[in-house]
Curated annotation (Swiss-Prot):
One term under GO cellular component: plasma membrane
Keyword Cytoplasm assigned: no
Localization terms from the record: Cell membrane
Bilayer topology term: Lipid-anchor; Single-pass membrane protein
Family the UniProt entry places it in: To M.leprae ML1177.
Protein name (database record): Putative lipoprotein LprD
Predominant location: membrane
Lipid-conjugated positions (S-diacylglycerol cysteine): 22
Signal sequence annotation: 1-21
Length: 126
């Protein structure tokens, strides 16, 4: 693996542009607050935009740090057991009565359809 640091000019330019843009918007909101039509909402935004600029630099710094030394994968420790009684029991299927005439008739109908389908599939063109 290479020991040289990777520089990404496009990413650095993006961080600089985003930071400058956030600081410019903060300055704009500050001047709006100081004007005669300024409100406390403008003051809130004037204080928020520098935080957004700081976050752009912080996120880039963490990105570079994680890229240089990625976090260690978790070690293959023992799998955790689920305590008994934590999960609900699976429902049991309802038992059908063995002598259900409707079910018997339906199954016979399905068997007849399967035979007809098999006959149609086995036809040869001669």
């Amino acid at each position: 693996m290479s020991t040289t640091r990777r520089r990404r000019p496009a990413l650095i330019a993006l961080v600089i542009i985003a930071t400058c843009g956030c600081l410019a918007l903060g300055w704009w909101q500050w001047t709006r607050f100081q004007s005669t039509s300024g409100t406390f909402q403008n003051l809130g935004y004037a204080l928020q935009w520098p935080l957004f600029a700081w976050f752009c630099v912080y996120a880039y710094r963490n990105f570079v740090r994680y890229e240089e030394t990625p976090p260690q994968p978790p070690t293959g420790g023992a799998a955790a057991e689920i305590p008994a009684g934590l999960l609900p029991e699976r429902p049991k299927p309802a038992q059908q009565p063995p002598d259900d005439p409707v079910l018997r008739e339906y199954n016979a109908y399905l068997a007849e359809l399967a035979k007809d389908d098999a006959r149609k599939q086995n036809r040869t063109t001669a």
